[in-house]
């Protein structure tokens, strides 16, 4: 009977540990969906080129702010997670910084490609580039919310 009781307690503790893990996962997922990121406007509904240009510029500015904010939050989460492990913290922060710089370069080149068909320097070219950047910024924000990966 005692062996059964102890093994039952062990199973109960394991279940509680699993529940704690699942609860932590649920909190992370909930935070991801509840986070106040503004939805970008649909600029294709503009009545003329100037409206589309203004809308695309506004969206880009907003998503840039959100991107910078989320990057700072990701860095803060990493610092909190690795606060007692200086070497790991330094390596993670270096990797995060390197990844962000590489992503920014990717975004720049991808959006250059997206606006390639329009005349360089035109409002249309800028609109395509801004819409591309806004879309990629939103994707990156979602990815940054998952950092640190564990």
Please name every model-derived segment.
Residues 31-36:
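N-terminal signal peptide c-region/cleavage motif recognized by signal peptidases
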Residues 1, 6-7, 86:
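Intrinsically disordered low-complexity regions specifically enriched for long asparagine
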């Amino acid at each position: 009977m005692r062996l059964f009781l102890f093994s039952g307690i062990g199973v109960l503790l394991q279940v509680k540990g699993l529940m704690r893990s699942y609860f932590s996962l649920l909190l992370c997922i909930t935070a991801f969906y509840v986070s106040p990121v503004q939805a970008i406007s649909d600029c294709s509904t503009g009545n003329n080129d100037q409206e589309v240009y203004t809308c695309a510029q506004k969206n880009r500015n907003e998503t840039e702010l959100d991107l910078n904010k989320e990057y700072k939050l990701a860095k803060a989460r990493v610092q909190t997670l690795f606060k007692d492990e200086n070497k790991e913290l330094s390596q993670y922060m270096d990797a995060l910084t390197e990844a962000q710089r590489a992503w920014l370069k990717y975004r720049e080149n991808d959006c250059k490609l997206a606006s390639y068909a329009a005349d360089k320097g035109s409002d249309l070219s800028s609109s395509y580039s801004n819409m591309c950047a806004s879309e990629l910024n939103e994707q990156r924000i979602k990815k940054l919310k998952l950092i640190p990966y564990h």
